[in-house]
Curated annotation (Swiss-Prot):
NCBIfam families listed in its UniProt record: PRK10707.1
Any one GO molecular-function label of the UniProt entry: coenzyme A diphosphatase activity
Cofactor(s) needed: Mn(2+); Mg(2+)
Motif segment (Nudix box): 67-89
Superkingdom per UniProt: Bacteria
Full protein name: Uncharacterized Nudix hydrolase NudL
Keywords tagged on the record: Hydrolase, Magnesium, Manganese, Metal-binding
Native species: Shigella flexneri serotype 5b (strain 8401)
PROSITE patterns: NUDIX, NUDIX_COA
Length: 192
């Protein structure tokens, strides 16, 4: 697939719905969810945030809107929608959920389910000052180009795991966020 010419219709036709894996949860893993907001345009965008530098965890990092599943959330999808509304004022009713990607285990002990949703292009984003320092849109075709991500193997407590690194304008996209974007690219058939 030529990444420069990806249209929303191309993306939607390539994206195959996956259901969350039911019995994948190891003991002591907390659940979290992120929304992968695809902006509905002829050449779609990918909405990302930069976390506040004042947060205890992942301060200043580029991320998708999301967070822990609360007791009040009916599902991981409901959690992703609630968090997107809290962090960047995306109303849940404005999101057309088209599916989920397989859960990802975070280094902080969460099992994170990426929820893929289409959002209108004219939403007035409003960053929650406590959690988000910036909201920006990256062209989806650029985001899904696998050649932009570079591997880094990290060794911690005798274990090794690979993270992916990339820049978009002044934003450093890496770690779980870059990994989720790569999984989305692979899901729609982008070849490494």
């Amino acid at each position: 697939m030529e990444y420069r010419s990806l249209t929303l219709d191309d993306f939607l036709s390539r994206f195959q719905l996956l259901r969350p894996q039911i019995n994948r949860e190891p003991l002591n893993h907390r659940q979290a969810a992120v929304l992968i907001p695809i902006v509905r345009r002829p050449q779609p965008g990918l909405l990302l945030t930069q976390r506040s530098i004042h947060l205890r965890k992942h301060a200043g990092q580029v991320a998708f809107p999301g967070g822990a599943v609360d007791d009040t959330d009916a599902s991981v999808i409901a959690a992703a929608l609630r968090e997107a509304e809290e962090e960047v004022a995306i109303p849940p009713s404005a999101v057309e959920v088209i599916g989920v990607l397989p859960p990802v285990d975070s280094v902080t002990g969460y099992q994170v389910t990426p929820v893929v949703g289409i959002i209108p292009p004219d939403l007035p984003y409003r960053a929650s000052e406590d959690e988000v320092s910036a909201v920006f849109e990256m062209p989806l075709a650029q985001a899904l180009h696998l050649g932009r991500y570079h591997p880094l193997d990290i060794y911690r407590r005798g274990d090794s795991h690979r993270v992916w690194l990339s820049w978009y304008e002044q934003y450093f996209v890496w770690g779980m966020t870059a990994g989720i974007i790569r999984e989305l690219a692979l899901q729609i058939g982008v070849k490494p």
